Amino acid sequence: MSALLEQKEQQERLREAAALGDIREVQKLVESGVDVNSQNEVNGWTCLHWACKRNHGQVVSYLLQSGADREILTTKGEMPVQLTSRREIRKIMGVEEADEEEEIPQLKKESELPFVPNYLANPAFPFIYTPAAEDSTQLQNGGPSPPPVSPPADSSPPLLPPTETPLLGAFPRDHSSLALVQNGDISAPSAILRTPESTKPGPVCQPPVSQNRSLFSVPSKPPVSLEPQNGTYAGPAPAFQPFFFTGAFPFNMQELVLKVRIQNPSLRENDFIEIELDRQELTYQELLRVSCCELGVNPDQVEKIRKLPNTLLRKDKDVARLQDFQELELVLMISDNNFLFRNAASTLTERPCYNRRASKLTY
């Protein structure tokens, strides 16, 4: 039973390698004895179907030389040649130009799906193997110098240059154009494939102002242009609220999460509670209102708001500079009716050296 499962796993690896264009992995699996005509149990696709679908001409040629059946059908009755979109691969499969115009367009309409599969909407990064990579390792190990690499016989330009590693940028929403770019039918625009920019030394902790302004600051004024004029910036710089990672990350970037409690040193357990403030309304009055509402305190009893350990909040700009999960204390006015401070007198009576008679003496 385990041998059968291992055999199916090897066949699935062969189909995956053919879909990615990994010619070395395909050669390794075929030489180890994996059946090139093995079909998937669900859709009936073989490794030749996948190689033709992804337009990997080198893999198609090798599979045909290894005995792959070009007439095998899927569960929908599709042959491998009907899945390709390149004339070069159709010639490799032995399809004439006259037959191509009659059969291929009609079969493509029949196999068109009403949705875009996930493996086509988010294709894997294409496997690119060049002899230069292997020769460079030989040169580093002291091996012989590599022979000059001749250009490929295929007239189609390579999708990616071998010397540069492009980055996958923002893909367009048209999945069909993305599939054509991956298959090499059209040239890739600069928005999809772009080379990495040259790295230059610069300040470490200076993120872009325009990006962080929309996330962490109060949009009180429209953005001011920061284009330099004669080497200097024109106009005042927009207000920027820095963001420091404190180990916990807020769930919603539109809210400012603060930790608030009532200042009472007589209590052994004086825990904080978390409150949320809208970043569009970071004012002192809003902070006072939300804090008193959550703690059940009358705003008239609040003497001041302290940012721990020893900073007093006085105005709206002080509140705008607050970061997520900062600790605040509400300092209340001491009065006889304030039940929170009744425990302060009881702590003296609990001491063993407390003299009740002496406490009532008047001088």
From Swiss-Prot:
Transmembrane segments: none annotated. Residues 135-167 are annotated as: Disordered. SMART domains: ANK (SM00248). The modification Phosphoserine is found at residue 176. SUPFAM superfamilies: Ankyrin repeat. InterPro entries: ANKRD40 (IPR039195), Ankyrin_rpt (IPR002110), Ankyrin_rpt-contain_sf (IPR036770). Residues 144-164 have a biased composition (Pro residues). Keywords: Acetylation, ANK repeat, Phosphoprotein, Repeat. The modification N-acetylmethionine is found at residue 1. ANK repeats lie at residues 9-38, 43-72. It comes from the Eukaryota. This is Ankyrin repeat domain-containing protein 40. The gene is Ankrd40.
